[in-house]
């Protein structure tokens, strides 16, 4: 009876699998180029929660391969816009795992198509994240990132950061195992010098982990061997991109004070002084190294006797620059205020110091890195939500040009443009015509059709503005030097009409800025939000009165009790 029952079960299961395969074959034929039958499409996302063993998967995969021609499968690329399935129905077959290296390369291939913050991530990313939920899987993902990300792809380091940032935090055992596998030291840094991608990727991984694990875990990760490895990568014999990411990794390790002291004691500042001279190098890789070296010498690894850059830079001809008081927290701005770089995992943004309300205006940007940046125009109402991935062009008060993904951004929606992908050294022009209510974008002098949609929300109060993905950098020209591709129509420049006092031009290093904040004395009756004006306003109906009128007018609910604000009453007697 048991044997008979088992035979009936096997027969029914075979029939069910046959029907399922037939159904999948018809679905695959129906979906066609939408990628239902591709390896990347629906075969690599997650594991079934049932207790079925892997042998069933193998049999099912063989049956599927015989039912669907291999050539057909390979010829149909996955539609990157189609949202992946996240859930699994009761009869849905288990998604099969792909080779880790293939998943990493698939993610790199489709990363340019991720243009919506609410868009589901690609199948490959979801699978990698699932794999990384175990120590063994996390180690496989990290080693694959080091092994297969190519040197020439401008988004390679950003993909490393993106994948590791979204993966679960590694355990202490996983970190220990990783250091044992890598076995880094000065000698390892000298090996495979003809293949710098491995060293670049290793440094990028270390930097991402240092940023993500700031604190005791970061201290434990910076072993003597890893410190020796990163310092060796800074030597002039190394490839510039290896030097760049080794320096960025050291910067991120230095976010923990104990690591900062350890790195400073290694005489790193002596090496950085040499690299600082590359800040204006015509080679754009060396220029990035020089920028980061100068920033580190000014902000992190101070050298005794060295004058800080802001104290000696000549700003006499500069009347408009990037605003160090109107910027998200992790963006690096050069001492002359015309160059910016992001090395954080967030989407950092900045506006310039000059606002325009009428007329025709133009500025240019030199592309130093060819990755994702959104550059254009924004009003004061445009919000910088760096940790949520929103920047210029992601609300109704800004419009941006994206030369990497070849898109125009407005109100968090994008549309393609006909310019080729930008590359290092390209010049992007930005024309704002407030008379005709239009914006025109140029790439090396070639213009696109005008953009007008932003003027449905605002017609004045525009600033030059930009947002940067990880490891991106560019230089702005607001008219302090001749433009490379001036437009044919008559226009004005910021530098001709703006004015900044000598004090307003100073971009202080972070340690100097913190020192000034410590000297600020706060009055007892000051506003609890701005700490500047007197707290002279009472909120009704809750009755709290710790705010000034300017701050109170910007709030809809009380910051103390969260009750809705119905009215605001100025208390004249509180003014002193």
From Swiss-Prot:
Domain B30.2/SPRY stretches = 300-483
**Pfam families assigned to the protein according to its UniProt record, in alphabetical order:** SPRY, zf-C3HC4_3
Which cysteines does the record link by disulfide bonds? Answer: none
Report the stretches of sequence that form zinc fingers (RING-type): 527-562
Q: Where in the cell is the protein located?
A: Secreted
Keyword rRNA-binding present in the record's keywords: the answer is: no
Q: Record's SUPFAM superfamilies?
A: ARM repeat (SSF48371), Concanavalin A-like lectins/glucanases (SSF49899), RING/U-box (SSF57850)
From start to end residue, where is composition biased (Basic residues)? 83-97
Indicate the secretion signal residues: 1-16
Main location class: secreted
Gene Ontology biological process terms from the UniProt entry: proteolysis involved in protein catabolic process
Q: What is this protein called?
A: RING finger and SPRY domain-containing protein 1
Its source organism is Macaca fascicularis (Crab-eating macaque)
Taxonomy of origin reads: Eukaryota, Metazoa, Chordata, Craniata, Vertebrata
